[in-house]
Amino acid sequence: MAKIQAIRGTKDILPDEQLYWQFIHEKVASLLKYANYKEIKTPIFENSDLYDRGIGENTDIVNKEMYRFNDRSNRDITLRPEGTAGVVRAFIENRMDVQNRLQKLWYSGPMFRYERPQSGRQRQFHQLGIEFIGSSDARADAEIIHLAMNIFNDLSVNDLQLDINSIGKAEDRNHYQAKLQEYLEQYYDDLDTDSQNRLSSNPIRILDTKNKYTQTILNDSPRISDFLSLESEKHFDDVCDYLTLLNVPYKINTQLVRGLDYYNDTAFEIKILKSQGQDTLCGGGRYDSLIHQLGGNKTPAVGCAIGLERLLLVAKDNILLPHMSIDCYIVSKGIKARKIGIIITQFLRNQLVKTELDISSSNFGKQLKQAHKKRAIACLILGDNEIQQETITIKWMYTQEQENMSIIEFKNKISYLKKKIAFNKKFNSY
């Protein structure tokens, strides 16, 4: 019988690793709360039409990477490959623009793409997204970029480079694509296979190529900056000015495009310069047409997404987790002691004291070893003597000091116990 294992491209996040994920989530939630962004959760699968129309039928994501299938009702379903389209669908369906035209939202969760697994890239991966819906003001673009940079700074992720570009409006891109296609057709035989396939359907996507030789051909290609309308030029200049005011350094990269068709005007990526694997941590831009394209009212928006696996790779060494310890570990021996132990366990938990009850039936020596292994601050001992006298023994694990008191007194002195636990936590390095 074949051994059952996790599917290639997926990864278990075990408890010790989950602590880092939780740390990042709490850090991000706190930062975004003070910017008045509210968390939203959308389903992990949607009608495939959402991504066909939203992301674009000529993109690699739709053509090659989506987990797409028919369910038992023969509906065309896709596991979400990114988060923005689902947020936009929720915005339209729930008429969130009626509640408040300006919606500042964020999300975090698993996404799915059929890609070659490598460091920082899995087939099930996690993204954090930030979306500012309802404003075409350049300050919204600057705010999204600044928030992303603040997240990295709060996690002590340094050596970052912000690449930014304007890809203009649809009309600007149509003029540009025609000139780009005309230029690249001269070199058709020299282009890599993917770029040859893109040349007729979506030539602007060739700018995203990783093929070194194709990149050299692109060095002398037309620049989209020469095709921007005055409105797009002004918007881009304003974004750059606001970033300067916010002390956010940036590099204008005229060949930067994003892998999703819904972007217009601002497009950006944040990269780490010392990365061993994938170096792009964050990407985003403006998507003023997407909401209308998916059936909503004309509503401008801007957002970004951060790859959490990649972020964790570069941030983990900078995260100092608090010592994970148990406030009280209860050991007991005998039927009566076990009954009292389970009652005291629930009493302490109700008092917000982190408590674990040893249910191993081992001797006291082995139970105390477990208390030590789990870094317990206090060990509560219930043995034959304690049961006969209706008392409890408290052993403070760091100092080895012991106290004995009646069970009634113990319950009445819960405030004393909590203060002493807090004091002993400062020295819990055994």
Curated annotation (Swiss-Prot):
Keywords: Aminoacyl-tRNA synthetase, ATP-binding, Chloroplast, Ligase, Nucleotide-binding, Plastid, Protein biosynthesis. Its EC number is 6.1.1.21. It catalyses: tRNA(His) + L-histidine + ATP = L-histidyl-tRNA(His) + AMP + diphosphate + H(+). GO terms for cellular component: chloroplast. GO terms for biological process: histidyl-tRNA aminoacylation. It is found in: Plastid, Chloroplast. GO terms for molecular function: ATP binding; histidine-tRNA ligase activity. It comes from the Eukaryota. It is an enzyme of class 6 (ligase). InterPro entries: aa-tRNA-synth_II (IPR006195), aa-tRNA-synth_II/BPL/LPL (IPR045864), Anticodon-bd (IPR004154), Anticodon-bd_dom_sf (IPR036621), His-tRNA-ligase (IPR015807), HisRS-like_core (IPR041715), HisRS/HisZ (IPR004516), HisRS_anticodon (IPR033656). Belongs to the class-II aminoacyl-tRNA synthetase family. This is Histidine--tRNA ligase, chloroplastic. It comes from Porphyra purpurea.
